[in-house]
């Protein structure tokens, strides 16, 4: 069925209205086309300008490369304005679409009318050709129906059959004209499709260029941020550099002050610290230079990127010019094709416009999504700003902590300087006393100067070796400090790796320290052997003195069977010339030291068990002070035993049970051995065999460095009151300690009847051959691998200058701190008492009158007379102090080096 025609009011009016409507529709379409193209171009340029301004405008970006809250507010306002403009644009597009729909409906109506007219005209032409026209009335009706609303509607209905040829020609011409119009419409539609494709390609290129511009702006912002961060780092590095320079200046000033006060060793350490800090400054300067080079490179990159941005802008301008030219061409072509447009084109265009409207709506949705994403990015940027602020606060807190640490270090340095000043004052006082004694003893020391010179040579050689070892220790300390700095720089690594790395380094350092300690012990063994020989010579000289019956000192001293002096304090002296009185006495036939670290009662035995020689336990001053057990150990008629018994100069009672004192003032038992305050048995040489939980003194096998016990193989507690006495006067009971005929030490090792060790191996020569292979010489003291003596608490107190303090602290080879007040008790004559007196193993000062009590021929009397078994001077002379001072300086240097180490290394060492 054919569609029914629409009947117009009048044929002439319908033609005019149709033409007017077509002209109006074409005008609207061209205007919309031009407006759409111009709007797209302006929008693209606006977006470009906005993006460029967002990336390069200094008003919207801060100096640090991050957005401020004002910028965020401006961005939000711009987004709102853009949303409003987009809504308005959508409303205008909808109105235009409605108008175009109306025009399309009109054109469709006209199309149907033309199709009906063509149908009737073709039908009439067929009938005319066939000759079946019928009656004239029927032919006229067909023509009137065919040409209603058509351009041929003005034809009269009263047609003659002779005029049918003209009418058929006109119909054929109109039909041919309609075909040409259809072809033109199809060509225009194809051309529009090509133009749309070309426009889409151009829009894609424009979008890609806009994306590149946006990315370049983002990269520029990131580079600006990085530049700002690098500038802040440079400022921080410069501030750190200035602080380090100030610290270096302060250290130089301290060095200049310390040149007049401190010894050479500490000046060397301070100079080395200065060198280290200078090296650190140089390294920091190198780092700063590298950072500056990086900044220059980044600036060059920014310049290159700015050039690229300019080139891209030029490309965009060129493309805009091309688009404008193409738009001009399109306008010209549209002007040519306006006359040829018809219904099919408009239908297709309207369909395309509808599709474009859908696409535009989708684009608007995408733009809204982009706006939401931009808002999310702004929130993320705000979060990043907050995180950066927190990081800056953390860095400030760290800087405050570093300042506090530096202040604490300065306070420690000041305290150390004060301690050194006090020590120097004490040394000056001692030197004054020594000078007074030297004036008295110059005549007697002339004979011993040759021996002393030989010893000085040996001591210098040993000092040189010790200095070399100290230099090695300093190098190791430098390596340790460098390692610690590296560890501070690498704190961001996992903690497990750091722990493993630290453990490996500590093991290596411990191995190095063990090797150095073994070397030091070997040297100390050599020194101990030389000391043994020297003691044997002293013993021989003492035997000569005993046969000669020398006189006692100036302070009404008691003289025993061997002619020994008993001092101003009426101390009791054994048959071997040893001091066994109120405090710091020796208790061996060979004059070995039994009082440097523990208290000894009237019989020469150990009266404390595990007593200390520090500043906080017993008082050893000149005024009748306390000596561990509450007894008085002063200068006149004092008590010296554990039970309050008197030990005077005239052979008074010296035992706990009021026993009789023998020729030497001590209690004499069945085997001619001395009996102490606790009733314990003492051998013929006056050695101690009794109570007191003694412990071993060897440090070779003990890896636990707290000195509670030196030898892990043979350390057993000795319980008092259960000892047996053998045929030779030695103890061979439950405690398994023995005192042999040679007067060996019975507190540190087990000794059998022959004087040798009753442990794993026994030698026939009377020396100690225990598990640690220590040798006990004629003096009875423990002479192990490191030539150290064994005190009451298991500490080392021997020739190596080891520590023997109240807390059982570490006793190394460097003369470390031993007392609760920070005083030393090493081999070099360090301070051990509250009054500044010395109580070491090298013949140091221990009494009120400046007397020596050590094993090397010490002074025990009030007048400075010598009573020791191996004394260098007989009446008022002790060993030369130069050797002791040199050894003390070396020991102090070691102690300073160890104290300079961090607490973690001190605990490990």
Curated annotation (Swiss-Prot):
The keyword Iron does not apply. Keywords: Coiled coil. Residues 692-719 have a biased composition (Basic residues). Residues 13-31, 78-88, 425-478, 524-542, 872-892 have a biased composition (Basic and acidic residues). Residues 607-620, 757-766 have a biased composition (Acidic residues). Residues 1-11 have a biased composition (Pro residues). Belongs to the GOLGA6 family. This is Golgin subfamily A member 6-like protein 2. It comes from Homo sapiens. The gene is GOLGA6L2.
């Amino acid at each position: 069925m054919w569609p029914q025609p629409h009947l117009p009011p009048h044929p002439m009016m319908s033609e005019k209205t149709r033409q007017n409507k077509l002209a109006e529709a074409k005008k609207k379409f061209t205007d919309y086309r031009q407006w759409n193209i111009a709007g797209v171009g302006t929008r693209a340029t606006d977006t470009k300008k906005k993006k460029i301004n967002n990336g390069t405008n200094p008003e919207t970006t801060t100096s640090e490369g991050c957005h401020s809250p004002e910028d965020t507010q401006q961005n939000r306002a711009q987004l709102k304005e853009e949303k409003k403009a987009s809504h308005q644009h959508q409303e205008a597009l909808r109105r235009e679409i409605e108008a175009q729909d109306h025009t399309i409906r009109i054109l469709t109506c006209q199309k149907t009318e033309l199709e009906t007219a063509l149908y009737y005209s073709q039908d009439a032409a067929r009938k005319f050709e066939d000759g079946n026209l019928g009656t004239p009335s029927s032919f006229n009706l067909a023509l009137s129906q065919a040409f209603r609303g058509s351009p041929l509607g003005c034809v009269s209905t009263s047609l003659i059959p002779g005029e049918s040829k003209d009418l058929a020609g006109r119909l054929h011409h109109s039909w041919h004209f309609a075909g040409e119009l259809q072809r033109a419409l199809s060509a225009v539609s194809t051309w529009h499709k090509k133009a749309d494709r070309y426009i889409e390609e151009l829009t894609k290129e424009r979008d890609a260029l806009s994306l590149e511009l946006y990315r370049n702006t983002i990269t520029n912002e990131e580079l600006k941020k990085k530049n700002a961060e690098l500038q802040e780092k440079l400022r921080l590095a410069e501030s750190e550099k200035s602080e380090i320079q100030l610290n270096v200046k302060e250290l130089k000033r301290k060095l200049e002050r310390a040149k007049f006060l401190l010894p050479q060793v500490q000046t060397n350490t301070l100079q080395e610290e200065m060198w280290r800090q200078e090296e650190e400054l140089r390294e920091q300067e190198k780092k700063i230079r590298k950072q500056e080079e990086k900044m220059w490179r980044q600036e060059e990159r920014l310049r290159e990127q700015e050039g690229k941005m300019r080139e891209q802008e030029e490309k965009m301008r060129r493309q805009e010019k091309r688009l404008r030219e193409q738009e001009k061409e399109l306008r010209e072509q549209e002007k040519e094709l306006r006359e040829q447009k018809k219904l099919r084109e408009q239908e297709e265009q309207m369909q395309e416009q509808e599709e474009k409207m859908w696409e535009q709506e989708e684009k608007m949705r995408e733009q809204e999504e982009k706006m939401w994403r931009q808002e999310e990015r702004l929130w993320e940027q705000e979060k990043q700003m907050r995180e950066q602020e927190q990081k800056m606060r953390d860095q400030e807190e760290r800087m405050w902590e570093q300042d506090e640490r530096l202040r604490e270090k300065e306070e420690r340095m000041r305290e150390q300087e004060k301690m050194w000043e006090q020590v120097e004052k004490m040394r000056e006082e001692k030197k004054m006393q020594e000078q007074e004694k030297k004036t008295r003893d110059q005549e007697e020391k002339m004979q011993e100067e040759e021996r002393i010179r030989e010893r000085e040579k040996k001591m210098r050689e040993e000092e040189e070796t010790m200095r070399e070892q100290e230099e090695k220790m300093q190098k190791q300390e430098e390596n340790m400090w460098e390692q610690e700095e590296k560890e501070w720089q690498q704190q961001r690594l996992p903690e497990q790796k750091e722990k493993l790395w630290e453990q490996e380094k500590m093991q290596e350092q411990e191995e190095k320290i063990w090797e150095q300690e073994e070397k030091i012990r070997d040297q100390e063994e050599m020194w101990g052997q030389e000391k043994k020989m020297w003691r044997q010579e002293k013993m021989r000289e003492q035997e000569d003195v005993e046969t000669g019956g020398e006189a006692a000192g100036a302070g009404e001293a008691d003289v025993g069977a061997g002619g020994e002096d008993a001092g101003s304090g009426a101390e009791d002296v054994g048959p071997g010339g040893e001091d066994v009185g109120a405090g710091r006495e020796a208790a061996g036939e060979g004059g070995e030291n039994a009082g440097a670290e523990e208290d000894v009662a009237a019989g020469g035995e150990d009266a404390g068990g595990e007593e200390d020689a520090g500043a906080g336990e017993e008082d050893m001053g000149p005024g009748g002070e306390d000596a561990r057990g509450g007894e008085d150990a002063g200068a006149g008629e004092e008590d010296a035993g554990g039970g309050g018994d008197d030990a005077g100069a005239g052979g008074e009672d010296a035992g706990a049970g009021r026993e009789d004192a023998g020729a030497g003032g001590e209690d004499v038992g069945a085997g001619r051995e001395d009996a102490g305050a606790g009733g314990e048995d003492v051998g013929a040489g006056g050695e101690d065999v009794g109570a007191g939980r003694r412990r071993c003194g060897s440090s070779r096998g003990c890896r636990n460095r707290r000195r509670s016990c030196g030898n892990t193989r043979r350390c057993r507690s000795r319980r008092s009151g259960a000892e047996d006495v053998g045929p030779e006067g030695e103890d061979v009971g439950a405690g398994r300690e023995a005192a042999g005929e040679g007067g060996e030490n019975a507190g540190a090792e087990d000794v059998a009847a022959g004087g040798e060790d009753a442990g794993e191996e026994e030698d026939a020569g009377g020396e100690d051959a225990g598990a640690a292979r220590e040798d006990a010489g004629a003096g009875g003291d423990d002479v192990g691998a490191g030539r150290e003596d064994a005190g009451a608490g298991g500490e080392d107190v021997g020739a190596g200058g080891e520590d023997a303090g109240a807390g059982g602290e570490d006793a190394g080879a460097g003369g470390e701190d031993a007392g609760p007040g920070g005083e030393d008790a090493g081999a070099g004559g360090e301070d051990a008492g509250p009054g500044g007196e010395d109580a070491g193993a090298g013949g140091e000062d221990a009494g009120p009158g400046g007397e020596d009590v050590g094993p090397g021929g010490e002074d025990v009397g009030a007048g400075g007379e010598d009573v020791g078994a191996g004394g260098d001077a007989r009446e008022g002379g002790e060993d030369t102090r130069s050797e002791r001072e040199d050894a003390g300086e070396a020991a102090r240097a070691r102690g300073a080096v160890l104290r300079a180490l961090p607490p973690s290394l001190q605990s490990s060492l």
